[in-house]
């Protein structure tokens, strides 16, 4: 019993000592990477990513209407069109990159820092948009993953989305 308590305390200390505001453990990122990989095994994975990305972004725009203005240059009015489809794929590819780098923290930090800078220079992008995007993912992923592990995904996605939105003021 004491041994289990010490292990739990040790894990808590590691999580609290981490420089990030999350604790995506090695086991968490292994679970997330495995489950994420299941989604993209199909030979038509780019089409699936585009469709999934469009669903996420149109849901985001529906839930936070001011997001529509941010996506005007990628033609959100024509969500099935090539410009918006390409943007949806870029976003899913960015998320794919981050998930695949979970086991390489220095590379992950560099990639997320780059994405943070890209969003920092876009006027109107807010931390709340990333929070809502995470919520949408958290409700959508269980619908497509049989063994969805909510705690692992929450731990890892929070770190990813927090880092990307870290340079935003609002």
UniProtKB/Swiss-Prot annotation:
The extracellular hemoglobin of the earthworm consists of 12 subunits that have a hexagonal bilayer structure with a molecular weight near 3.8 million. Each one-twelfth subunit is composed primarily of disulfide linked trimers (chains A, B, and C) and monomers (chain D). Its main location: secreted. Keywords: Disulfide bond, Heme, Iron, Metal-binding, Oxygen transport, Secreted, Signal, Transport. The keyword Secreted applies. Transmembrane segments: none annotated. The keyword Iron applies. Residues 1-17 form the signal peptide. GO terms for molecular function: heme binding; iron ion binding; oxygen binding; oxygen carrier activity. It comes from Lumbricus terrestris. Disulfide bonds join 24-156. SUPFAM superfamilies: Globin-like. Gene3D superfamilies: Globins (1.10.490.10). InterPro entries: Globin, Globin-like_sf, Globin/Proto, Haemoglobin_extracell, Mb-like_M. Residues 23-169 form the Globin domain. GO terms for cellular component: extracellular region; hemoglobin complex. Belongs to the globin family. CDD domains: Mb-like. Heme b binds at residue 119. It is found in: Secreted. This is Extracellular globin-3.
């Amino acid at each position: 019993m004491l041994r289990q308590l010490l292990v739990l305390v040790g894990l808590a200390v590691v999580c609290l000592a981490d420089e990030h505001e999350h604790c995506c453990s090695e086991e968490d990122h292994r679970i997330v990477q495995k489950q994420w990989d299941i989604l993209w095994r199909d030979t038509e994975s780019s089409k699936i990513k585009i469709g999934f990305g469009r669903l996420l972004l149109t849901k985001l725009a529906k839930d936070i209407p001011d997001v529509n203005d941010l996506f005007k240059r990628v033609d959100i009015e024509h969500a099935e069109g090539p410009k918006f489809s390409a943007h949806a794929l870029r976003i899913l590819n960015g998320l794919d990159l981050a998930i695949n780098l979970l086991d390489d923290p220095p590379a992950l930090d560099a990639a997320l820092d780059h994405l943070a800078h890209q969003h920092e220079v876009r006027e109107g992008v807010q931390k709340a948009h990333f929070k809502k995007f995470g919520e949408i993912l958290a409700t959508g992923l269980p619908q497509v993953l049989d063994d969805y592990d909510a705690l692992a995904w929450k731990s890892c996605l929070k770190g990813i989305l927090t880092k990307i939105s870290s340079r935003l003021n609002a």
